């Protein structure tokens, strides 16, 4: 039975918020289901002046993605981070899939019209 991804969530210079931690962990697990090549999620939430920043690094088989978001509210920064990660992971995933299709299409001779 395959294990789930390794998820590390850090709250830097702020108190840990269990509700946000649980929503981030759930979001990471859903992303790992959709993108099975991912093996590790590292997320860091920190205050930044008047708002909050969220950083993430996702690694896995042929996958390395980094993301950064900002928002006034900590929860909003966390939600934006998950949305950004999904978009970036989809981009990397599609590149891996369509790269092979493009290569196969280039190697296949085109049919001539008669």
Task: Say what each PLM segment does.
Residues 1-114:
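N-terminal, polar/charged subdomain of small-to-medium soluble alpha/beta proteins
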């Amino acid at each position: 039975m395959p294990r789930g991804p390794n998820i590390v969530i850090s709250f830097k210079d702020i108190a840990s918020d269990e509700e946000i931690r649980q929503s981030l962990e759930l979001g990471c697990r859903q992303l790992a289901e959709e993108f099975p090549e991912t093996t590790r999620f590292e997320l860091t939430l920190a205050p930044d002046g008047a708002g909050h920043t969220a950083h993430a690094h996702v690694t896995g088989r042929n996958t390395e993605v980094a993301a950064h978001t900002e928002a006034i509210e900590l929860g909003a920064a966390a939600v934006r981070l998950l949305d950004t990660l999904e978009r970036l992971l989809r981009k990397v995933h599609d590149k891996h899939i369509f790269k092979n299709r493009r290569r196969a299409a280039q190697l296949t001779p085109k049919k001539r019209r008669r």
